[in-house]
């Protein structure tokens, strides 16, 4: 049975656990489609040199949703390294590489809102994310990404992995 799964990651230990969980649960399903998704922080174009701007602009040709946004190349490199490790974990769990994709966004919304928007636009059946390590006091005042996603997600199952 076709099953679309969005795994929201940030390179943390808890997002690695979310990837491991997804591998255990969805490896038996040859029709599962898993997408690793990360939000990079947006920065001002003024903080980049001409070569960095040129590199980022060339990457945006295929991604009109990123028009006008800029990010640090080293953040993208770190993300791509994690994506590679996560894909390897999923393959080791029994998934085929063709079942796994990766995608990123650049923060123009709050991270939770960006995850929710991607989940809705991609029509995912399941959304998996790791629990963040906020203290109870900070979580009470600020909320957390996982709390907001659980509260506001519609039309999909949400799994928060600790």
Predicted features by range, described:
Residues 84-126:
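Structural beta-alpha unit
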């Amino acid at each position: 049975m076709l099953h679309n799964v969005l795994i929201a990651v940030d390179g943390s230990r808890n997002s690695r656990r979310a990837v491991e969980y997804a591998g255990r649960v969805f490896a038996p399903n040859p029709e599962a489609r898993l997408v690793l998704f990360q939000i990079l922080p947006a920065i001002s174009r003024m903080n980049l040199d001409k070569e960095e701007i040129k590199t980022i602009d060339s990457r945006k040709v295929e991604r009109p949703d990123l028009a006008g946004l800029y990010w640090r190349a080293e953040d993208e490199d770190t993300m791509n390294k994690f994506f590679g490790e996560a894909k390897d974990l999923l393959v080791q769990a029994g998934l085929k590489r063709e079942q796994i994709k990766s995608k990123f966004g650049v923060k123009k919304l709050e991270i939770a809102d960006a995850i929710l928007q991607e989940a809705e636009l991609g029509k995912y059946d399941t959304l998996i994310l790791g629990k963040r390590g906020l203290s109870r006091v900070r979580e009470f005042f600020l909320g957390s990404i996982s709390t907001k996603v659980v509260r506001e997600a519609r039309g999909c199952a949400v799994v928060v992995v600790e």
